[in-house]
Regions:
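A short beta-strand-loop-beta hairpin characteristic of the jelly-roll/cupin
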Residues: 1-9
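Cyclic-nucleotide recognition modules
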Residues: 9-67
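Short, structured interface segments
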Residues: 49-79, 139-164
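Short hydrophobic beta-strand segments
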Residues: 84-90, 313-316
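Beta1-alpha1 glycine-rich phosphate/pyrophosphate-binding loop at the start
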Residues: 87, 91-119, 128, 135, ...
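FAD-binding core/adjacent interface of flavoenzyme oxidoreductases
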Residues: 117, 122-174, 189-190, 207-208, ...
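Rossmann-like dinucleotide/flavin-binding elements
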Residues: 164-202, 285, 291-293, 299-352, ...
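A Rossmann-like FAD-binding core segment of flavoenzymes
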Residues: 228-270, 275, 331-442, 485-489
Length: 490
Protein backbone atom coordinates (compact mmCIF):
# COMPACT_ATOMS: atom_id res chain seq x y z
CA UNK A 1 0.00 0.00 0.00
CA UNK A 2 1.08 3.55 -0.79
CA UNK A 3 0.13 5.76 2.15
CA UNK A 4 2.10 8.82 1.09
CA UNK A 5 -0.77 10.62 -0.66
CA UNK A 6 -4.15 11.94 0.40
CA UNK A 7 -5.67 8.45 0.45
CA UNK A 8 -4.03 4.97 0.57
CA UNK A 9 -3.58 3.27 -2.81
CA UNK A 10 -2.83 -0.32 -3.74
CA UNK A 11 0.58 -0.58 -5.40
CA UNK A 12 0.58 -4.33 -6.05
CA UNK A 13 -0.83 -7.60 -4.72
CA UNK A 14 1.50 -10.47 -3.78
CA UNK A 15 0.43 -14.09 -3.56
CA UNK A 16 1.84 -17.24 -1.92
CA UNK A 17 5.56 -17.82 -2.52
CA UNK A 18 6.31 -14.24 -3.58
CA UNK A 19 8.56 -11.73 -1.82
CA UNK A 20 8.24 -8.06 -0.96
CA UNK A 21 10.90 -5.39 -0.46
CA UNK A 22 13.07 -3.03 -2.48
CA UNK A 23 16.62 -1.64 -2.33
CA UNK A 24 15.99 -0.08 1.10
CA UNK A 25 16.14 -3.57 2.62
CA UNK A 26 19.88 -3.82 1.93
CA UNK A 27 20.63 -1.07 4.45
CA UNK A 28 17.73 -1.64 6.82
CA UNK A 29 16.11 1.66 5.85
CA UNK A 30 12.32 1.99 6.15
CA UNK A 31 10.26 0.82 3.19
CA UNK A 32 8.43 3.33 1.01
CA UNK A 33 5.25 1.23 1.05
CA UNK A 34 3.41 -0.78 3.68
CA UNK A 35 1.85 -4.24 3.60
CA UNK A 36 -1.64 -5.35 4.55
CA UNK A 37 -2.70 -9.00 4.80
CA UNK A 38 -6.12 -9.81 3.33
CA UNK A 39 -6.41 -12.96 5.41
CA UNK A 40 -4.48 -15.40 7.55
CA UNK A 41 -0.94 -15.84 6.27
CA UNK A 42 2.57 -16.82 7.32
CA UNK A 43 5.33 -14.31 6.57
CA UNK A 44 9.09 -14.74 6.91
CA UNK A 45 11.09 -11.64 7.84
CA UNK A 46 14.62 -11.51 6.42
CA UNK A 47 17.14 -9.20 8.10
CA UNK A 48 19.59 -7.12 6.00
CA UNK A 49 22.52 -9.35 7.02
CA UNK A 50 20.61 -12.53 6.13
CA UNK A 51 19.52 -10.95 2.85
CA UNK A 52 23.13 -10.20 1.92
CA UNK A 53 24.08 -13.81 2.66
CA UNK A 54 21.36 -14.99 0.29
CA UNK A 55 22.47 -12.57 -2.43
CA UNK A 56 26.12 -13.59 -2.19
CA UNK A 57 25.78 -17.33 -1.52
CA UNK A 58 22.95 -18.04 -3.97
CA UNK A 59 23.70 -15.89 -7.04
CA UNK A 60 20.85 -17.21 -9.20
CA UNK A 61 18.27 -16.35 -6.56
CA UNK A 62 20.18 -13.19 -5.67
CA UNK A 63 19.98 -11.92 -9.25
CA UNK A 64 16.19 -12.31 -9.25
CA UNK A 65 15.85 -10.49 -5.93
CA UNK A 66 18.16 -7.61 -6.85
CA UNK A 67 16.59 -7.07 -10.26
CA UNK A 68 13.15 -7.01 -8.63
CA UNK A 69 14.32 -4.55 -5.96
CA UNK A 70 15.79 -2.15 -8.53
CA UNK A 71 12.77 -2.43 -10.83
CA UNK A 72 10.32 -1.80 -7.99
CA UNK A 73 12.01 1.45 -6.99
CA UNK A 74 12.04 2.58 -10.63
CA UNK A 75 8.38 1.67 -11.05
CA UNK A 76 7.43 3.66 -7.97
CA UNK A 77 9.29 6.74 -9.15
CA UNK A 78 7.93 6.50 -12.68
CA UNK A 79 4.36 5.48 -11.89
CA UNK A 80 2.94 9.00 -11.88
CA UNK A 81 0.65 8.03 -9.00
CA UNK A 82 3.17 7.58 -6.18
CA UNK A 83 3.40 10.79 -4.16
CA UNK A 84 6.30 9.95 -1.87
CA UNK A 85 7.47 12.70 0.44
CA UNK A 86 5.83 16.07 -0.04
CA UNK A 87 8.04 19.15 0.06
CA UNK A 88 6.11 22.38 0.47
CA UNK A 89 8.15 25.50 -0.21
CA UNK A 90 8.86 28.45 -2.43
CA UNK A 91 10.80 28.18 -5.67
CA UNK A 92 12.70 31.26 -4.48
CA UNK A 93 13.79 29.66 -1.19
CA UNK A 94 17.35 28.35 -0.91
CA UNK A 95 16.29 25.88 1.79
CA UNK A 96 13.48 24.51 -0.38
CA UNK A 97 15.98 23.93 -3.16
CA UNK A 98 18.49 22.36 -0.76
CA UNK A 99 15.89 19.89 0.55
CA UNK A 100 14.73 18.96 -2.95
CA UNK A 101 18.33 18.60 -4.08
CA UNK A 102 19.20 16.34 -1.13
CA UNK A 103 16.19 14.07 -1.76
CA UNK A 104 16.95 13.87 -5.47
CA UNK A 105 20.62 13.02 -4.83
CA UNK A 106 19.54 10.18 -2.55
CA UNK A 107 16.92 8.85 -5.00
CA UNK A 108 14.07 9.45 -2.55
CA UNK A 109 10.77 9.85 -4.44
CA UNK A 110 9.10 13.15 -3.58
CA UNK A 111 6.56 15.64 -4.85
CA UNK A 112 7.33 19.36 -4.71
CA UNK A 113 4.42 21.69 -4.00
CA UNK A 114 5.37 25.19 -5.12
CA UNK A 115 4.25 27.82 -2.63
CA UNK A 116 3.62 30.32 -5.44
CA UNK A 117 1.87 28.07 -7.94
CA UNK A 118 0.34 24.91 -6.46
CA UNK A 119 -3.38 25.16 -5.56
CA UNK A 120 -3.08 22.45 -2.85
CA UNK A 121 -0.63 24.43 -0.72
CA UNK A 122 -3.09 26.57 1.25
CA UNK A 123 -5.26 23.57 2.14
CA UNK A 124 -2.29 21.46 3.27
CA UNK A 125 -0.72 24.22 5.35
CA UNK A 126 -4.06 24.78 7.06
CA UNK A 127 -4.35 21.04 7.85
CA UNK A 128 -0.88 21.12 9.42
CA UNK A 129 -1.62 24.32 11.34
CA UNK A 130 1.14 26.19 9.50
CA UNK A 131 1.58 29.42 7.56
CA UNK A 132 3.78 30.26 4.58
CA UNK A 133 6.37 31.61 7.01
CA UNK A 134 6.85 28.07 8.40
CA UNK A 135 7.95 26.64 5.05
CA UNK A 136 9.77 24.72 3.73
CA UNK A 137 8.26 21.65 5.35
CA UNK A 138 8.42 17.93 4.60
CA UNK A 139 5.35 15.71 4.98
CA UNK A 140 4.37 12.07 4.45
CA UNK A 141 0.70 11.54 3.74
CA UNK A 142 -1.23 13.58 6.29
CA UNK A 143 1.66 13.60 8.74
CA UNK A 144 4.02 16.55 9.06
CA UNK A 145 7.56 15.23 9.46
CA UNK A 146 9.93 18.19 9.59
CA UNK A 147 10.12 21.96 9.34
CA UNK A 148 13.12 23.24 7.37
CA UNK A 149 15.33 20.28 8.36
CA UNK A 150 19.08 20.14 7.92
CA UNK A 151 20.38 17.45 5.57
CA UNK A 152 21.45 15.40 8.57
CA UNK A 153 18.02 15.66 10.24
CA UNK A 154 16.36 14.66 6.99
CA UNK A 155 18.69 11.68 6.54
CA UNK A 156 18.11 10.46 10.11
CA UNK A 157 14.32 10.81 9.85
CA UNK A 158 14.26 8.89 6.56
CA UNK A 159 16.54 6.17 7.92
CA UNK A 160 19.27 6.68 5.33
CA UNK A 161 21.74 7.81 7.99
CA UNK A 162 22.15 5.13 10.60
CA UNK A 163 24.62 4.89 13.52
CA UNK A 164 28.03 3.48 12.66
CA UNK A 165 28.24 -0.16 13.70
CA UNK A 166 32.00 -0.36 14.33
CA UNK A 167 34.57 1.83 16.03
CA UNK A 168 37.38 0.68 13.73
CA UNK A 169 36.94 -0.18 10.03
CA UNK A 170 39.44 -1.82 7.71
CA UNK A 171 38.63 0.83 5.11
CA UNK A 172 36.95 4.19 5.58
CA UNK A 173 36.14 6.06 2.37
CA UNK A 174 35.31 9.75 2.52
CA UNK A 175 33.18 10.69 -0.48
CA UNK A 176 30.68 8.66 -2.50
CA UNK A 177 31.52 9.78 -6.01
CA UNK A 178 32.67 7.31 -8.68
CA UNK A 179 36.05 6.70 -6.98
CA UNK A 180 34.55 6.23 -3.52
CA UNK A 181 31.76 3.94 -4.71
CA UNK A 182 34.20 1.81 -6.74
CA UNK A 183 36.41 1.43 -3.67
CA UNK A 184 33.37 0.48 -1.58
CA UNK A 185 32.35 -2.25 -4.04
CA UNK A 186 35.83 -3.73 -4.35
CA UNK A 187 36.74 -3.33 -0.68
CA UNK A 188 33.55 -4.89 0.68
CA UNK A 189 33.51 -7.68 -1.93
CA UNK A 190 37.05 -8.62 -0.88
CA UNK A 191 36.18 -8.94 2.79
CA UNK A 192 37.18 -5.54 4.15
CA UNK A 193 34.85 -3.92 6.67
CA UNK A 194 34.01 -0.80 4.67
CA UNK A 195 32.11 2.40 5.37
CA UNK A 196 31.63 5.37 3.04
CA UNK A 197 31.10 8.75 4.71
CA UNK A 198 29.14 11.09 2.42
CA UNK A 199 27.99 14.63 3.27
CA UNK A 200 25.10 14.90 0.75
CA UNK A 201 24.32 11.95 -1.52
CA UNK A 202 26.03 9.33 -3.69
CA UNK A 203 27.31 10.09 -7.17
CA UNK A 204 29.36 13.26 -6.79
CA UNK A 205 29.45 15.55 -9.82
CA UNK A 206 28.97 12.56 -12.10
CA UNK A 207 25.75 11.67 -10.29
CA UNK A 208 24.23 14.93 -11.49
CA UNK A 209 24.92 14.29 -15.16
CA UNK A 210 21.77 13.67 -17.18
CA UNK A 211 23.60 11.55 -19.74
CA UNK A 212 27.10 10.07 -19.85
CA UNK A 213 27.61 8.71 -23.36
CA UNK A 214 31.29 7.74 -23.30
CA UNK A 215 31.29 5.37 -20.32
CA UNK A 216 32.35 1.82 -21.19
CA UNK A 217 29.49 -0.66 -21.57
CA UNK A 218 26.62 1.80 -22.08
CA UNK A 219 26.33 2.38 -25.85
CA UNK A 220 23.10 4.37 -25.47
CA UNK A 221 24.44 6.34 -22.52
CA UNK A 222 23.57 6.26 -18.84
CA UNK A 223 22.48 8.93 -16.39
CA UNK A 224 24.83 9.69 -13.55
CA UNK A 225 22.01 9.00 -11.10
CA UNK A 226 21.42 5.50 -12.49
CA UNK A 227 25.13 4.71 -12.42
CA UNK A 228 25.40 5.87 -8.80
CA UNK A 229 22.22 4.08 -7.71
CA UNK A 230 23.40 0.75 -9.11
CA UNK A 231 26.82 1.21 -7.50
CA UNK A 232 25.18 1.86 -4.11
CA UNK A 233 23.09 -1.31 -4.44
CA UNK A 234 26.18 -3.26 -5.48
CA UNK A 235 28.22 -1.97 -2.54
CA UNK A 236 25.34 -2.70 -0.16
CA UNK A 237 25.07 -6.24 -1.49
CA UNK A 238 28.62 -6.89 -0.29
CA UNK A 239 28.08 -5.25 3.08
CA UNK A 240 29.51 -1.74 2.66
CA UNK A 241 27.77 0.93 4.75
CA UNK A 242 26.91 4.36 3.35
CA UNK A 243 25.48 6.76 5.96
CA UNK A 244 24.64 9.93 4.00
CA UNK A 245 24.41 13.32 5.65
CA UNK A 246 27.71 12.54 7.39
CA UNK A 247 30.08 15.49 7.33
CA UNK A 248 33.73 14.91 8.20
CA UNK A 249 35.16 18.02 9.84
CA UNK A 250 38.67 16.97 10.83
CA UNK A 251 41.32 14.28 10.42
CA UNK A 252 43.78 13.49 13.20
CA UNK A 253 46.43 10.88 13.87
CA UNK A 254 46.16 10.70 17.65
CA UNK A 255 46.72 6.94 17.68
CA UNK A 256 48.24 4.44 15.29
CA UNK A 257 45.30 4.80 12.91
CA UNK A 258 43.69 7.84 11.26
CA UNK A 259 40.71 9.19 13.22
CA UNK A 260 37.88 11.02 11.47
CA UNK A 261 35.88 13.57 13.44
CA UNK A 262 32.26 14.01 12.35
CA UNK A 263 29.99 17.03 12.56
CA UNK A 264 27.96 15.57 15.43
CA UNK A 265 31.05 14.93 17.58
CA UNK A 266 31.23 11.23 16.73
CA UNK A 267 34.54 9.71 15.62
CA UNK A 268 35.43 6.75 13.44
CA UNK A 269 38.84 5.10 13.14
CA UNK A 270 40.30 3.60 9.98
CA UNK A 271 43.04 1.05 9.50
CA UNK A 272 43.19 2.52 5.99
CA UNK A 273 41.62 5.74 4.75
CA UNK A 274 40.69 6.66 1.18
CA UNK A 275 40.13 10.33 0.43
CA UNK A 276 37.66 10.45 -2.47
CA UNK A 277 35.89 13.73 -1.78
CA UNK A 278 36.11 14.98 -5.35
CA UNK A 279 35.99 18.60 -6.39
CA UNK A 280 33.22 21.19 -6.53
CA UNK A 281 32.80 23.75 -9.28
CA UNK A 282 34.35 27.09 -8.41
CA UNK A 283 31.86 29.68 -7.21
CA UNK A 284 31.05 32.24 -9.89
CA UNK A 285 32.71 35.61 -9.34
CA UNK A 286 30.19 38.06 -10.73
CA UNK A 287 28.43 41.04 -9.23
CA UNK A 288 25.21 40.06 -7.46
CA UNK A 289 25.73 36.29 -7.72
CA UNK A 290 25.65 35.63 -3.95
CA UNK A 291 21.97 36.51 -3.60
CA UNK A 292 20.90 34.07 -6.31
CA UNK A 293 22.71 30.87 -5.25
CA UNK A 294 20.07 28.16 -4.99
CA UNK A 295 17.36 30.43 -6.44
CA UNK A 296 18.61 31.31 -9.91
CA UNK A 297 22.30 30.35 -9.83
CA UNK A 298 22.99 26.61 -9.93
CA UNK A 299 26.01 24.32 -10.13
CA UNK A 300 24.24 21.29 -11.60
CA UNK A 301 21.57 20.68 -14.22
CA UNK A 302 19.19 17.89 -13.23
CA UNK A 303 15.39 17.56 -13.34
CA UNK A 304 15.36 19.39 -10.02
CA UNK A 305 16.84 22.53 -11.58
CA UNK A 306 15.08 22.08 -14.92
CA UNK A 307 11.69 22.31 -13.18
CA UNK A 308 12.55 25.88 -12.23
CA UNK A 309 13.18 27.13 -15.76
CA UNK A 310 11.00 25.12 -18.14
CA UNK A 311 10.04 27.29 -21.13
CA UNK A 312 12.39 30.11 -20.13
CA UNK A 313 15.77 31.37 -21.30
CA UNK A 314 18.79 30.02 -19.41
CA UNK A 315 22.54 30.56 -19.56
CA UNK A 316 25.45 28.22 -18.87
CA UNK A 317 29.06 29.12 -18.14
CA UNK A 318 31.80 26.59 -18.89
CA UNK A 319 33.47 24.72 -21.72
CA UNK A 320 33.97 21.21 -20.34
CA UNK A 321 31.95 18.02 -20.75
CA UNK A 322 29.69 18.79 -17.79
CA UNK A 323 28.69 22.11 -19.36
CA UNK A 324 28.12 20.42 -22.71
CA UNK A 325 25.94 17.68 -21.24
CA UNK A 326 23.95 20.27 -19.30
CA UNK A 327 23.46 22.48 -22.36
CA UNK A 328 22.06 19.60 -24.42
CA UNK A 329 19.78 18.48 -21.57
CA UNK A 330 18.45 21.97 -20.83
CA UNK A 331 17.87 22.71 -24.51
CA UNK A 332 15.02 20.20 -24.40
CA UNK A 333 13.46 22.04 -21.45
CA UNK A 334 14.22 25.73 -22.00
CA UNK A 335 13.17 28.13 -24.73
CA UNK A 336 16.76 29.17 -25.36
CA UNK A 337 20.17 28.24 -23.95
CA UNK A 338 23.14 30.63 -23.98
CA UNK A 339 26.45 28.77 -23.62
CA UNK A 340 29.12 31.19 -22.39
CA UNK A 341 32.83 30.33 -22.77
CA UNK A 342 35.86 32.52 -22.02
CA UNK A 343 37.90 31.17 -24.92
CA UNK A 344 37.26 30.75 -28.61
CA UNK A 345 37.47 26.97 -29.11
CA UNK A 346 34.81 24.66 -27.69
CA UNK A 347 36.88 21.64 -28.77
CA UNK A 348 39.65 22.51 -26.30
CA UNK A 349 38.04 20.90 -23.22
CA UNK A 350 34.89 19.23 -24.55
CA UNK A 351 34.45 15.85 -26.25
CA UNK A 352 33.76 16.04 -29.98
CA UNK A 353 30.42 14.25 -29.77
CA UNK A 354 29.12 16.94 -27.40
CA UNK A 355 30.45 19.79 -29.56
CA UNK A 356 28.64 18.32 -32.56
CA UNK A 357 25.44 17.91 -30.54
CA UNK A 358 25.60 21.56 -29.44
CA UNK A 359 26.24 22.79 -32.98
CA UNK A 360 23.22 20.83 -34.22
CA UNK A 361 20.83 22.10 -31.53
CA UNK A 362 19.05 25.20 -32.88
CA UNK A 363 18.11 26.78 -29.55
CA UNK A 364 21.67 26.78 -28.17
CA UNK A 365 23.59 30.00 -28.84
CA UNK A 366 27.35 29.83 -28.24
CA UNK A 367 28.91 33.03 -26.90
CA UNK A 368 32.69 32.81 -27.42
CA UNK A 369 35.27 35.01 -25.65
CA UNK A 370 32.58 36.01 -23.18
CA UNK A 371 32.33 36.34 -19.40
CA UNK A 372 29.44 36.96 -17.01
CA UNK A 373 29.83 40.34 -15.32
CA UNK A 374 26.60 40.89 -13.39
CA UNK A 375 23.41 39.11 -12.27
CA UNK A 376 20.28 41.17 -11.71
CA UNK A 377 16.81 40.73 -10.25
CA UNK A 378 14.75 41.32 -7.15
CA UNK A 379 13.41 38.19 -5.51
CA UNK A 380 14.53 36.04 -8.41
CA UNK A 381 17.00 36.23 -11.29
CA UNK A 382 15.78 38.27 -14.26
CA UNK A 383 18.88 38.93 -16.36
CA UNK A 384 22.64 38.62 -16.63
CA UNK A 385 25.15 41.02 -18.13
CA UNK A 386 27.93 39.53 -20.24
CA UNK A 387 30.98 41.15 -21.79
CA UNK A 388 33.07 40.07 -24.77
CA UNK A 389 36.68 39.99 -23.55
CA UNK A 390 37.98 40.70 -27.08
CA UNK A 391 35.75 43.55 -28.25
CA UNK A 392 34.41 44.90 -24.95
CA UNK A 393 30.84 44.57 -26.22
CA UNK A 394 28.29 44.31 -23.38
CA UNK A 395 24.99 42.41 -23.70
CA UNK A 396 22.11 41.98 -21.28
CA UNK A 397 20.44 38.57 -21.53
CA UNK A 398 17.03 37.85 -20.01
CA UNK A 399 17.46 34.55 -18.15
CA UNK A 400 15.52 32.66 -15.49
CA UNK A 401 18.61 30.71 -14.42
CA UNK A 402 22.37 30.66 -14.74
CA UNK A 403 24.30 27.38 -14.53
CA UNK A 404 28.00 27.54 -13.71
CA UNK A 405 30.47 24.76 -14.59
CA UNK A 406 33.82 26.49 -14.24
CA UNK A 407 37.02 25.47 -12.48
CA UNK A 408 37.47 22.82 -9.84
CA UNK A 409 37.93 23.33 -6.11
CA UNK A 410 38.88 20.17 -4.18
CA UNK A 411 37.06 19.44 -0.94
CA UNK A 412 40.21 19.03 1.13
CA UNK A 413 40.19 21.80 3.74
CA UNK A 414 39.32 19.28 6.50
CA UNK A 415 42.59 17.40 6.02
CA UNK A 416 45.43 17.64 8.54
CA UNK A 417 48.88 19.07 7.63
CA UNK A 418 50.27 15.51 7.43
CA UNK A 419 48.41 15.12 4.12
CA UNK A 420 50.36 17.17 1.59
CA UNK A 421 48.46 19.14 -1.03
CA UNK A 422 49.51 21.10 -4.09
CA UNK A 423 49.09 24.85 -4.51
CA UNK A 424 45.44 24.42 -5.54
CA UNK A 425 44.56 22.11 -2.65
CA UNK A 426 44.59 18.80 -4.53
CA UNK A 427 46.09 15.86 -2.61
CA UNK A 428 49.58 14.74 -3.63
CA UNK A 429 50.27 11.00 -3.94
CA UNK A 430 52.90 8.48 -4.99
CA UNK A 431 56.33 9.72 -6.11
CA UNK A 432 55.29 13.33 -5.42
CA UNK A 433 55.36 12.67 -1.64
CA UNK A 434 58.37 10.34 -1.38
CA UNK A 435 60.52 13.18 0.01
CA UNK A 436 57.84 14.53 2.34
CA UNK A 437 58.88 15.02 5.99
CA UNK A 438 55.67 13.18 6.93
CA UNK A 439 56.67 10.07 4.96
CA UNK A 440 58.45 7.76 7.42
CA UNK A 441 58.56 4.21 5.92
CA UNK A 442 61.69 3.02 4.12
CA UNK A 443 59.68 1.89 1.13
CA UNK A 444 58.40 4.19 -1.62
CA UNK A 445 54.75 5.32 -1.39
CA UNK A 446 52.21 3.35 -3.38
CA UNK A 447 50.97 5.16 -6.48
CA UNK A 448 47.80 6.47 -4.79
CA UNK A 449 49.24 6.75 -1.27
CA UNK A 450 49.48 10.18 0.34
CA UNK A 451 52.26 11.60 2.51
CA UNK A 452 50.89 9.65 5.48
CA UNK A 453 51.22 5.82 5.24
CA UNK A 454 47.89 4.03 4.91
CA UNK A 455 46.03 7.10 3.70
CA UNK A 456 45.18 7.05 -0.01
CA UNK A 457 43.52 9.46 -2.45
CA UNK A 458 41.58 8.74 -5.64
CA UNK A 459 39.46 10.58 -8.16
CA UNK A 460 39.11 14.30 -8.75
CA UNK A 461 40.56 15.28 -5.34
CA UNK A 462 43.91 13.73 -6.25
CA UNK A 463 46.57 15.98 -7.76
CA UNK A 464 47.24 15.04 -11.37
CA UNK A 465 44.20 12.79 -11.79
CA UNK A 466 42.26 12.62 -15.06
CA UNK A 467 38.90 14.26 -14.44
CA UNK A 468 36.73 11.57 -16.03
CA UNK A 469 34.23 9.10 -14.53
CA UNK A 470 36.00 6.01 -15.87
CA UNK A 471 39.36 7.22 -14.54
CA UNK A 472 37.90 7.83 -11.09
CA UNK A 473 36.31 4.37 -11.01
CA UNK A 474 39.65 2.84 -11.98
CA UNK A 475 41.51 4.75 -9.27
CA UNK A 476 38.97 3.72 -6.63
CA UNK A 477 39.39 0.06 -7.55
CA UNK A 478 43.19 0.39 -7.70
CA UNK A 479 43.28 2.00 -4.25
CA UNK A 480 41.78 -1.15 -2.72
CA UNK A 481 44.70 -3.20 -4.05
CA UNK A 482 47.10 -0.83 -2.29
CA UNK A 483 44.99 -1.09 0.88
CA UNK A 484 45.54 -4.86 0.87
CA UNK A 485 49.29 -4.35 0.40
CA UNK A 486 49.41 -1.90 3.30
CA UNK A 487 47.41 -4.16 5.62
CA UNK A 488 49.90 -6.97 4.97
CA UNK A 489 52.61 -4.74 6.45
CA UNK A 490 50.74 -4.23 9.72
Amino acid sequence: MDESGETPNTVTVHGPGEFTGDVAQLSGSPSLVSGVARGDCEVYEVSPDALRQILNNHPDLGDVILQAFIARRQLLKGSGTFTGLRVIGSRYSRDTFRIRDFLAENRMPFTWLDLEADPQVDKLLKEFGLTEADTPVVAWGRKLLLRNPSNRELAETLGIRRPLELEVYDLVVVGAGPAGLAAAVYGASEGLSTVVLERTGPGGQAGRSMRIENYLGFPTGVTGAELAERAVVQAGKFGARLPVGTLVTKLTFDNTYPTLHLEDGETVTAKCLLIATGADYRRLDAEGCAQFEGCGLYYAATFNEAQMCRGSNVALVGGGNSAGQAAVFLAAQARKVYLVIRGNDLHKDMSSYLVQRIEQTPNIELLRNTEVRRMSGDRYLKSIEVVNNKTGEVRTLETAALFSFIGAVPWSEWLSPEIERDAKGFVRTGPAVSQSPYWTPRRQPFLLETSHPGVFAAGDVRSGSVKRVASSVGEGAMAVQFVHEFLKEM
